[in-house]
Each structure stands twice: as structure tokens, then as C-alpha cells.
């Protein structure tokens, strides 16, 4: 049984659409690569929280980015749920048997990498120790309190070098880690959808630096983005 505070997440996952979550839809014939991530809610020492990872700083793309545990599906993964749990175990040492899956969000598309991502929502019913297991992919493992994500002064709007704007969060004890991109978008828009978001100042901007996006790549190697999904509606705080 999940705690009462998590019921809006469970119910929201059933009702939310891809158009509520993302501005891009995969074009016909894109043949995207399949991947899955785990959005795992638990109850930590500071109250309800989310399990997140900080990507290794030497990675070729998005080094140091805060993200859900997860990755590309393997041929042995029977379902996206199985893939998300496997990846979380490989990255953090999480015991999948302690996770109750309470929802699966609509599949979303990442145009630059042509990944179709399934977000699996879990309740950490029986907690297990977590740590960095794969140092090639993960720099640190974080438990970020939900209250920290809801605090308006922890919210900023990122500015991509190409001009795109996106929701983001300042996390960590010193608020020195930037949670942005796909993971921040899913969290922000799901929280918007279920009514958890508190009014925040969207005019507080954080300009993304090239190294945060490209790693060892150069800006010229980043693919051009397609036209956005016109059905996606920007709302307050997005």
C-alpha cells in the first residue's frame, strides 16, 4: 500500500498524456531507440523524496547532469519496467524487489539522441542501500526531498544556447546542483498536472554553458531540433 501523499502521483500518471509532458512528438519513421528510467519515490530522513543520480563528469554528453536512474533497454528486458529496474540496480545497487511499480508515464521522445523514453514510477516500499556502482556512468547518488523541489526559491528557468527555455531546480545541500533537461521537465510538468507546483518566478534565468550540454563534443556536432509539438501548451511555471 502506498502512502496517502503519493496517491496524487499514482492517479496523475494514469490521466496525464504525452502532450501534457512534452513539446516534441516522434515523426513517422524515426525508429527511435528504446529506453526506460525509474522515477522512484521514497520516504527519507527529510520526508518524501526522489532517487536521482548525477552523471559522471567525464561523459561525452551532458556530463554531471542530474537524472533519473535508467538507460537503453537490453534485448533481455521483457518490458520497460524490467529495463528501468535493471538499470537502477546497475547504477545504484537498488534492490528491485523492494520497489512497487505504481504507474508508467506516456513514452516521450528525445530528438537529439532519438531515444524514446518510458518513465516508470515506483514506490520504494522496502528500502535498500544505494551507492555509486558504475563509476563510468554515475558520479553520485542523491535522495532529493520533494519539499526541496516544491520550494519556489529553488526554481529557475534554463536558457539553452539555442534559445530554448526549460524548467529547472536547484538541489543539494548548498543548492549547487542544477536539475534540468528531460528529468526536470518530467518532474515539473507532472507536478503541474497534479497541482503540487507552487507559484515561482519564471524570470529567474540560468544560462546553460556549452560544457553542460556537449561534454567533449563541440556545439557544431549537436543536431538541429525539429519543430515542436503544437498541441503542447505551456502553463504557469513552465
Regions found by a protein language model. Name each.
Residues 133-168, 173:
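NUDIX/MutT-family hydrolases
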Residues 1-67, 72-90, 94-104, 108-121, ...:
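N-terminal leader/linker segments that precede catalytic domains of diphosphate-processing enzymes
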Amino acid at each position: 500500500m502506498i502512502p496517502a501523499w503519493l496517491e496524487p502521483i499514482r492517479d496523475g500518471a494514469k490521466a496525464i498524456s504525452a502532450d501534457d509532458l512534452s513539446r516534441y512528438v516522434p515523426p513517422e519513421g524515426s525508429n527511435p531507440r528504446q529506453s526506460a528510467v525509474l522515477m522512484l519515490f521514497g520516504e527519507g530522513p527529510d520526508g518524501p523524496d526522489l532517487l536521482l543520480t548525477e552523471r559522471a563528469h567525464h561523459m561525452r554528453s551532458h556530463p554531471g547532469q542530474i537524472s533519473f536512474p535508467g538507460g537503453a533497454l537490453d534485448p533481455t528486458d521483457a518490458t520497460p519496467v524490467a529495463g528501468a529496474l535493471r538499470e537502477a540496480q546497475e547504477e545504484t545497487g537498488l534492490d528491485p524487489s523492494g520497489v512497487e511499480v505504481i504507474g508508467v508515464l506516456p513514452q516521450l521522445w528525445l530528438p537529439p539522441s532519438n531515444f524514446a523514453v518510458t518513465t516508470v514510477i515506483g514506490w520504494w516500499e522496502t528500502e535498500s542501500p544505494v551507492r555509486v556502482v558504475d563509476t563510468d556512468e554515475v558520479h553520485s547518488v542523491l535522495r532529493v526531498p520533494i519539499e526541496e523541489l516544491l520550494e519556489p526559491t529553488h526554481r529557475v528557468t534554463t536558457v539553452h544556447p539555442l534559445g530554448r527555455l526549460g524548467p529547472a531546480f536547484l538541489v543539494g545541500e548548498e543548492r549547487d546542483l542544477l536539475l534540468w533537461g528531460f528529468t526536470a521537465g518530467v518532474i515539473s510538468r507532472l507536478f503541474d498536472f497534479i497541482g503540487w507546483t507552487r507559484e515561482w518566478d519564471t524570470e529567474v534565468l540560468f544560462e546553460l554553458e556549452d560544457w553542460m550540454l556537449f561534454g567533449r563534443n563541440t556545439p557544431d556536432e549537436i543536431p538541429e531540433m525539429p519543430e515542436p509539438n503544437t498541441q503542447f501548451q505551456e502553463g504557469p511555471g513552465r
